[in-house]
Amino acid sequence: MNKTITALTIIMASFATNASVLPETPVPFKSGTGAIDNDTVYIGLGSAGTAWYKLDTQAKDKKWTALAAFPGGPRDQATSAFIDGNLYVFGGIGKNSEGLTQVFNDVHKYNPKTNSWVKLMSHAPMGMAGHVTFVHNGKAYVTGGVNQNIFNGYFEDLNEAGKDSTTIDKINAHYFDKKAEDYFFNKFLLSFDPSTQQWSYAGESPWYGTAGAAVVNKGDKTWLINGEAKPGLRTDAVFELDFTGNNLKWNKLAPVASPDGVAGGFAGMSNDSLIFAGGAGFKGSRENYQNGKNYAHEGLKKSYSADIHLWHNGKWDKSGELSQGRAYGVSLPWNNSLLIIGGETAGGKAVTDSVLISVKDNKVTVQN
């Protein structure tokens, strides 16, 4: 027993303001996206609107620098990845030319050398919002996310309802009162080759698609952790994609953040330890759903997790805590640790700080 406790010792490192992980973001930052290349961090979109910023983490005087604005308009839930020195941004949720909220399936490329954006003549075969993106062998892979037709239809209906609260209530009840499988979340794995700008089918989950999962990859393995199984209902599932050999294998690991799960959590690696932290969800929604209530989160308050879990010996252990619950920020690998930038806390408040989670000998260190 003592040995177990020792292995899960929580070390909460307290630092003065001038020793914070990174300078505060230029604006409170949530629901955006980010990537890192050659120790330079890039973040943008979400609550930052069309703005993008970069920060050289190795600079003596660390500061955020504004970049050229994103040409595709403000967006939430876009994803991004660096491939061969260029930053690619995939999809997201925003307004179309008619002012309607919609899911996009487009791709934009940013060239750091010229500080310029270009919209590629390439469209994914389905919408990309709530999806995850990771890079393997020079290609970007996308999976998960909401169904574009169902999501866009919901917002078209809300737009037509205007300010009629009775009609809006009916639309919401109709939208949320369905089983998880009736939302057709994306369970396909798509690959994007930047050299050809072509999308290809790369496989599909033998289980179900999720939205708002956390993703982390190392070598030939990628993990998808939690996320929504349907609007308002999270899952505690953890999926592993194994690219070892010629055939992609899908595995299901032990669950985490049970029983309700979270969405918008943070995932990363530190000294070969798989980390999962934070996220938001509705406590009691899973029980409601299992009892036949499809509108499972109706009347429930969104809660924000501060838990830090480590994957150890085939199971998840709660191994530490964030200073407060947080979700919907950016997870990046940095200094052999998990770097969290921004996010939102209770009440949906966007934040400007960063957190660094490190693991050594199964001991968690949290630097704020």
From Swiss-Prot:
Coiled coil: none annotated. Keywords: Carbohydrate metabolism, Isomerase, Kelch repeat, Periplasm, Repeat, Signal. It is found in: Periplasm. Its EC number is 5.1.3.24. It is an enzyme of class 5 (isomerase). Kelch repeats lie at residues 40-84, 86-137, 139-173, 174-219, 222-265, 287-336, 338-367. Residues 1-19 form the signal peptide. GO terms for molecular function: racemase and epimerase activity, acting on carbohydrates and derivatives. It catalyses: N-acetyl-alpha-neuraminate = N-acetyl-beta-neuraminate. InterPro entries: Kelch-typ_b-propeller, NANM, NanM_proteobact. Homodimer. HAMAP family: NanM. Converts alpha-N-acetylneuranimic acid (Neu5Ac) to the beta-anomer, accelerating the equilibrium between the alpha- and beta-anomers. Probably facilitates sialidase-negative bacteria to compete successfully for limited amounts of extracellular Neu5Ac, which is likely taken up in the beta-anomer. In addition, the rapid removal of sialic acid from solution might be advantageous to the bacterium to damp down host responses. Belongs to the NanM family. This is N-acetylneuraminate epimerase. It comes from Escherichia coli O1:K1 / APEC. The lineage of its organism: Bacteria, Pseudomonadati, Pseudomonadota, Gammaproteobacteria, Enterobacterales.
